[in-house]
Curated annotation (Swiss-Prot):
Protein family membership: Belongs to the adenosylhomocysteinase family.
UniProt key word Cytoplasm: yes
Pathway: Amino-acid biosynthesis; L-homocysteine biosynthesis; L-homocysteine from S-adenosyl-L-homocysteine: step 1/1
Positions with a binding annotation for NAD(+): 191-193, 225, 254-259, 277, 312, 333-335, 378
GO biological process: L-homocysteine biosynthetic process; one-carbon metabolic process; S-adenosylmethionine cycle
Function: May play a key role in the regulation of the intracellular concentration of adenosylhomocysteine.
Name listed for the protein in its UniProt record: Adenosylhomocysteinase
Known cofactor(s): NAD(+)
Native source organism of the sequence: Zymomonas mobilis subsp. mobilis (strain ATCC 31821 / ZM4 / CP4)
Top-level enzyme category: hydrolase
Keyword set, alphabetical order: Cytoplasm, Hydrolase, NAD, One-carbon metabolism
Catalytic activity, as annotated: S-adenosyl-L-homocysteine + H2O = L-homocysteine + adenosine
CDD domains the record matches: SAHH (cd00401)
The encoding gene: ahcY
Amino acid sequence: MANEPYIVRDISLAGWGRKEIDIAEGEMPGLMALREEYAAKKPLKGARITGSLHMTIQTAVLIETLVDLGAEVRWASCNIFSTQDHAAAAIAEQNIPVFAVKGESLEEYWDYVDRIFDWGKGETANMILDDGGDATMFVLWGAKLEAGVEFPAPQNEEEEIFQKTVRRRVAATPGFLTKTAKAIKGVSEETTTGVHRLYEIAKKGELLFPAINVNDSVTKSKFDNLYGCKESLVDAIRRATDVMLAGKVACVAGFGDVGKGSAASLRNGGARVLVTEVDPICALQAAMEGYEVVTLEEAAPRADIFVTCTGNADIITLDHMRAMKQHAIVCNIGHFDSEIQINSLANMKWTEIKPQVDLVKFPDGKEIIVLAKGRLVNLGCATGHPSFVMSASFTNQVLAQIELFCNTDKYQKDVYMLPKHLDEKVAALHLPKLGVHLSKLTQKQADYIGVPVNGPFKPDHYRY
């Protein structure tokens, strides 16, 4: 498989991709600063990074930063709908192996995950950069299978295809994924769902290499998850449906950082926003922000637009969808497609209006509009978060890769956070672009509150 240098939609799109990448670089000061800081040191020289993260223009800037810092990279998207084909083409044109096409089948998706581990010449990856945990799960389950542990019964079509692909790799190159797992110095994980998977694996004692939780860096979760969703959610809904948000009733399921950004996004568009929550603290936050907190059973017949962002499963059920209004819009901005019971609609009549926009007709004649087949709407129906906020997230990713690759002996087979001083560094790198002038503590002031003059300024437990 390593013989194919790339799989993209159309390599001739590379020129268009390069133009957008050039513009994005101007909006991604953190990554560009790291290129300058580490230009001579090349701290990732010798790193072979298997990357599974949405293949967008912004990710192209991340990939080229990793390469500038000395790494070799093989890349796939972490979602079947999120690739921007011109971005993938631009990366392929730079002779960086990339396997990503917008609108992949599930078979293609898992084949591409397999390919990013296939370095050829007997080599393996020694680092993983992950978003959602699929690449990590691929190598961990491969090693389990090679150790004689059997898969549990698959619960859905995707699990069947995942298991089939891992089995194929194990049969083709016995011992390869065990060898890969032993070579991995660490994984940096981008998103809430992937981090949850890592903590579950670590709790069972089954994590085979160290991991850094990038998602819970303040400059990721409080910016990408919040401000990113605040801009990208309504962009996706409008591009997909041309709906006017003003005056509509929208329901946001979940009021974590993504839910907070999503609710603000819809409110800023003029919608009246309902919120559903299971956590009393988040529910109280939503209520005190002025949102009406209800159950989904109460929201189903009232709302015009539904957005899930819980990271959980079966949030919007078939019964909820049956109770919805004619032409209610249903979408998800959580990482996986488990939040909406899309499989329960399999026997309904589906009419594709345009890519990633489907009209689903119930037996009684009522129709709802499903976006991106329940997968990430902001990347399926639009282009995701703006470059600037992704610069903060991806600067964390690069720092995590450097930390794990260069300081491997500091880490056990567990999940870690980036230290506070690096979190503050990421923020500081983005201030000049916004014209921010930081105040500076005097030594007396620093002593008074018990912090160094140049930080870190907050304890690890501080809630921003």
